[in-house]
């Protein structure tokens, strides 16, 4: 299994157990980002058969049961809110950090990143109100944000990751 980690914090943010798709259905964005679909799951419904506390149950589930988004729960992502102005300042700084990283570690990616990042960020800014932003476990605002949005009538969000802000680790 491959786990994707943030290049600046080493936060685990995704794995190859999720099918990677073109971000926003746009193949041109695929060179610098990928999108995965999340699912909801039930957390805390542990029934060990010790006792039947049905008075605590609601619809057959215990009181400690909650529905969670699998990616958020598995990788301990935390939602954060940003104004459009704050996001613009963040993304400018983050893209400069990525570019510097690429110049040092992957110079063959520099031109691709310069060409493809701007349209992706423009798309995010144009549709800013449709996004929720997530941070990795370290809660470091210098790290990469994860972009979440709902596609069409889907009941769980999709998550978009900037590929050049991640590295793979095999387990």
From Swiss-Prot:
Report the locations given in the UniProt record.
Answer: Cytoplasm
Write out the entry's keywords from A to Z.
Calcium, Cytoplasm
Q: From which domain of life does this come?
A: Eukaryota
* A Gene Ontology term for the protein's cellular component: cytoplasm
What's a Gene Ontology MF term here? calcium ion binding
Cited Gene3D superfamilies: Metal Binding Protein, Guanine Nucleotide Exchange Factor, Chain A
Which residue windows are coiled coil? none
Domain TCTP, by residue range, is 1-171
- What family is this protein classified in? Belongs to the TCTP family.
Q: What's this chain's function? A: Involved in calcium binding and microtubule stabilization.
What's the further remark here?
Answer: Seems to be one of the target of artemisinin.
Tell me what this protein is called: Translationally-controlled tumor protein homolog
Question: What lineage does the source organism belong to?
Answer: Eukaryota, Sar, Alveolata, Apicomplexa, Aconoidasida
């Amino acid at each position: 299994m491959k786990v994707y980690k943030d290049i600046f914090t080493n936060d685990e943010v995704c794995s190859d157990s999720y099918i990677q798709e073109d971000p926003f259905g746009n193949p041109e964005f695929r060179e610098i980002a990928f999108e995965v679909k999340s699912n909801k799951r039930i957390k805390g419904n542990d029934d060990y058969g010790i006792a039947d506390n049905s008075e605590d149950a609601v619809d057959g589930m215990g009181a400690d049961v909650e529905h969670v988004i699998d990616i958020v729960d598995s990788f301990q992502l935390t939602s954060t809110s940003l104004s459009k102005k704050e996001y613009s300042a963040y993304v400018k700084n983050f893209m400069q950090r990525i570019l510097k990283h690429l110049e040092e570690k992957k110079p063959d990616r520099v031109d691709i990143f310069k060409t493809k990042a701007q349209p992706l960020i423009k798309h995010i800014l144009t549709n800013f109100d449709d996004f929720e932003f997530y941070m990795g476990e370290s809660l470091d605002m210098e790290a990469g944000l994860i972009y979440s949005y709902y596609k069409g009538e889907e009941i769980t969000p999709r998550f978009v990751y900037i590929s050049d802000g991640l590295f793979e680790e095999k387990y």
